[in-house]
């Protein structure tokens, strides 16, 4: 670990007029708003240069609580109304089921600028898809996918019950607490979250591969955005590739927007051949293009595939093998999405829609060519 130098420690100082205080505050009860601590975060935490991740509004660093030695994650946000909103929404959700906990928040000066520092529990188990990729030959089953979706749904249910829309539910924001088998999956990064009771959600900010159709145009949107994202994540969990693709190398192409708007996707074989009809039906209900027809979170949680996950078939899926084979591509996709997160403010009325006849799922075509060249490819599922 790289400890902070005296210079680094000195760069994170209390704002003018701030008073000292004590150590690790622990997570507040869900929904409780607290004021940031005004003394230096380095009084309580030893900072590292190790970057754990990049959020929508700031990077996340490794840190250690000085008294307990507890390893934590520190997110630095330069103070702004947007940053305050992120802290507020995450604080309201912190302590909820399957949501990353906030331990402390500080208001300090960094390089002469006021900033907010969010200390969170460290999610040492890594991202959802990385964990599945690393399984090797161990089969990933439909029942496991159902259990994962139930956990994600539990987090969304908690947020929606408090009239918070997350608006950026995606695999990269779903992290495990540890590498252990009993690790808990949790949702993080509230950089795009908004309260749905104050005003209609009209800001076109999102990660393109998991965006609901109504976000792609001037229509208002709400919690149903999160339900659409659940459908996309569920689709990927069950086969290893997303239902919608950009064919141009852009983060989001006109053709991809068109397919999302029209709800154009399929369940191609062999990856979907043995997946249950219940699972496919649930995906169809989540990917409805009309938000008023899409399932609510309560309906999702009450669907048999979710609330009776113990009777979901333990069918081996292609998911782990597909994710492993396309690992380099998935890293590229994630980079595209990360770079697009804060900048996607598109005037969709000005975009020329690409002819669907010229649109192909290039990743799926690539997989099919590989399968055609190997007579054993169609048996891959049985060898996981």
UniProtKB/Swiss-Prot annotation:
Gene null: resulting phenotype: No visible phenotype. Mice are fertile and do not exhibit behavioral phenotype. Mice do not show decreased production of inflammatory cytokines such as TNF and IL6 upon LPS-stimulation. Mice lacking both Mapkapk2 and Mapkapk3 show further reduction of TNF production, compared to mice lacking only Mapkapk2. These data suggest that Mapkapk3 may function additively in stress-induced cytokine production. MAPKAPK3 knockdown homozygous mice develop Bruch's membrane abnormal thickening and thinning progressing with age.
Protein name in the entry: MAP kinase-activated protein kinase 3
Complexes and interactors: Heterodimer with p38-alpha/MAPK14. The heterodimer with p38-alpha/MAPK14 forms a stable complex: molecules are positioned 'face to face' so that the ATP-binding sites of both kinases are at the heterodimer interface. Interacts with TCF3 and with polycomb proteins, such as PCH2 and BMI1/PCGF4.
Segments of skewed composition (Polar residues): 372-384
GO biological process: macropinocytosis; response to cytokine; response to lipopolysaccharide; toll-like receptor signaling pathway
UniProt keyword Nucleotide-binding, yes or no: yes
Residue list for modification Phosphothreonine: 203, 315
Reaction(s) catalysed (UniProt annotation): L-seryl-[protein] + ATP = O-phospho-L-seryl-[protein] + ADP + H(+); L-threonyl-[protein] + ATP = O-phospho-L-threonyl-[protein] + ADP + H(+)
Impact upon substituting residue 203 to A: Prevents degradation of isoform 3
Enzyme Commission number(s) of this protein: 2.7.11.1
Organism encoding this protein: Mus musculus
Spans through the membrane: none
Motif Nuclear export signal (NES): chain residues: 337-346
Residue(s) carrying N-acetylmethionine: 1
Protein role: Stress-activated serine/threonine-protein kinase involved in cytokines production, endocytosis, cell migration, chromatin remodeling and transcriptional regulation. Following stress, it is phosphorylated and activated by MAP kinase p38-alpha/MAPK14, leading to phosphorylation of substrates. Phosphorylates serine in the peptide sequence, Hyd-X-R-X(2)-S, where Hyd is a large hydrophobic residue. MAPKAPK2 and MAPKAPK3, share the same function and substrate specificity, but MAPKAPK3 kinase activity and level in protein expression are lower compared to MAPKAPK2.
Tissue: Ubiquitously expressed (at protein level). Isoform 3 is expressed in skeletal muscles and heart.
Phosphoserine modification, residue list: 253, 309
Region p38 MAPK-binding site, residue ranges: 347-371
Motif Bipartite nuclear localization signal 2 positions after renumbering to this chain: 366-370
Post-translation changes: Phosphorylated and activated by MAPK1/ERK2 and MAPK3/ERK1. Isoform 3 is degraded following phosphorylation at Thr-203.
């Amino acid at each position: 670990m790289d400890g902070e130098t005296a210079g680094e420690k000195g760069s994170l100082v209390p704002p003018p007029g701030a008073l000292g205080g004590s150590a690790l505050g622990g997570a507040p009860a869900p929904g409780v708003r607290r004021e940031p601590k005004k003394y230096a975060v380095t009084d309580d935490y030893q900072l590292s240069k190790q970057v754990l991740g990049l959020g929508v509004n700031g990077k996340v660093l490794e840190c250690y609580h000085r008294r307990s030695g507890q390893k934590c994650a520190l997110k630095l946000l330069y103070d702004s109304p947007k940053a305050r909103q992120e802290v507020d929404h995450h604080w309201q959700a912190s302590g909820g089921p399957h949501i990353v906990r906030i331990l402390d928040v500080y208001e300090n000066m960094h390089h002469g600028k006021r900033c907010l520092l969010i200390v969170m529990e460290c999610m040492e188990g890594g991202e959802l898809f990385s964990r599945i990729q690393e399984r090797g030959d161990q089969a990933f089953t439909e029942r496991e996918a159902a259990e994962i979706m139930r956990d994600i749904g539990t987090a969304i249910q908690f947020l929606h019950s408090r009239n918070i829309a997350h608006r950026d539910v995606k695999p990269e924001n779903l992290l495990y607490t540890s590498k252990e088998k009993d690790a808990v999956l949790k949702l993080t990064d509230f950089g795009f979250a908004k309260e749905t009771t104050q005003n209609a959600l009209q800001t076109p900010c999102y990660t393109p591969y998991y965006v609901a159709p109504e976000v792609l145009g001037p229509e208002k949107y709400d919690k149903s955005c999160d339900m659409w994202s659940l459908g996309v994540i569920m689709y990927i969990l069950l086969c290893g590739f997303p239902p919608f693709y950009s064919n141009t190398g852009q983060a989001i192409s006109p053709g991809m927007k068109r397919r999302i708007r029209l709800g154009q996707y399929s369940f191609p074989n062999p990856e979907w051949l043995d997946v249950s009809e219940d699972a496919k039906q649930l995906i169809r209900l989540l990917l409805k293009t009309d938000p008023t027809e899409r399932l609510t979170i309560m309906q999702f949680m009450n669907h048999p595939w979710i609330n009776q996950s113990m009777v979901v078939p333990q069918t081996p899926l292609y998911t782990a093998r597909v994710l492993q084979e396309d690992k380099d591509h998935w890293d590229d996709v994630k980079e595209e999405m990360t770079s697009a997160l804060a900048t996607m403010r598109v005037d969709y009325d000005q975009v020329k829609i690409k002819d669907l006849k010229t649109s192909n799922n290039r990743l799926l075509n690539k997989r099919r060519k590989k399968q055609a060249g190997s007579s054993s490819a169609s048996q891959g599922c049985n060898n996981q």
